[in-house]
Amino acid sequence: MTGMSLRTVVFGLILSLVCVRAAHARTDFPGMLPASAERAASVAPAPPADTLPAAPADPFPAAVSADTLSAAAFPAPADSLGATAAARKRSFVRRIIDYFGESTQDRTFEKKIDFTFAGGPSYSKNTSLGIGILAAGLYRLDRTDSVTVPSDVSLYANVSVSGFYSVGIEGNTIFAHNRQRVDYTLEFSSAPTYTWGIGYNDVQKDDKRSYTEQRYEIKARYLREILPHAYIGGLLSFDHAQASKYDGETPLFGDQRLRYTTTGLGLTVEYDSRDFIPNPFKGIYLSFQNIFYPKGLGTCDKLLQRMTFTADFYQRVWTDCILAFDLYGEFNSSGTPWPMLARMGGNQRMRGYYKGQYTDNDLITAQLELRQRVWRRIGCVAWAGAGNVFPTFREFDWAETLPNYGFGLRWELKKRVNIRLDYGFGKNTDSFLLSINEAF
């Protein structure tokens, strides 16, 4: 999902916590069940012995969605005049509590697909007032297989009065014994945004321009295990982007067109020993992707190429504390059009920077994060990192490296599936973000 779409649906979660908490206070329940609604995270029925201890039930039920802030709106019942009415109202609230409480349980052995739904009003400074909905599901291709982790799928939609919208589906399909995987993303979005130009020096001029970016993306990968934890596979990518409603009279991106369509075909090689993908406690993840965009399969004027590299490492350092490291690089061929350039920022890397403020052909980022469970479902993190955008390796300038650091809170929805609240800082910038699952 996009950064704004995840923030849109997640804010609804916070509102639902307040509403159901208020209902609990008026109806005098002895306690509430733990809650969650989550985009599919592959949770094995029996976690490894060295995982962090399971958190006790939390009194706040919640539901989460995609990448902008959003909340499941469930109004608390009004004070009643009679015992019968009160019983009916308590029954309604209890059904809500039970619904989210049961979503923490693995029902993939009983159901073909176990869906959880959430939705409600949303607001953020980027997207304004809106509404978002989410359906997150877990399923198993073989419900007699207790070794393979569940597959997941998420469907989401967001719309706001500012003109922002996002509709999409994404997921991971895991085959028997994790020997084959398919992951996919399909998204349609339109977002009012800004551009500062291309390159580090353009940002220093502080001359941003507004425009609306519409995007249609389809991405899919197939991976097959060839050695223990080692995978090889292919990928397909289709991307259509166009800019409109821009301010100013000069061209928005110089002599580049405002609309591009690209189709990419590529190869992926990975080593993945992580114990749990959304929130690893141990393991190593190495990934190399090489994608070619043929001229005849799009509107670009030449054959384009993109290479990406990821190296992640996770290790327990003391009780309930994980040290995580992430190194990421993205390298595009010369002449790459504006929609395909590397964009710094977002909710995964260089948190605190507006995504797209620093844009160029190539990008390298690194970050080190300490993750500590504090009490029950509550945890905290602190991180530090740096990043650089540059046109070519020969023009790489260490003096243009940008700092990044921040801290955050974690609340566990399901076992090892967290809502994260982060506040990131950078060069002359800072930003709050709310999302689901760890950043890397």
What are the roles of these predicted feature ranges?
Residues 114-123, 148-161, 167, 284-296, ...:
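Transmembrane beta-strand segments that form the barrel wall of outer-membrane beta-barrel proteins
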Residues 265-266, 270, 275-373:
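C-terminal outer-membrane beta-barrel translocator/porin domains of Gram-negative envelope proteins
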Residues 117-119, 135, 153-157, 182-186, ...:
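Membrane-embedded beta-strand positions of outer-membrane beta-barrel proteins
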Residues 155-156, 203-208, 249-256, 293-299, ...:
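Extracellular loop and loop/strand-boundary signature of outer-membrane beta-barrel proteins
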Residues 266-267, 406-413, 429-440:
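Outer-membrane beta-barrel "beta-signal"
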Residues 104-113, 141-150, 176-181, 227-229, ...:
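Short loop/turn motifs that connect adjacent beta-strands in outer-membrane beta-barrel proteins
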Residues 107-117, 123-261, 418, 426-440:
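Gram-negative/organellar outer-membrane beta-barrel architecture
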Residues 332-420:
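Outer membrane beta-barrel transmembrane domains
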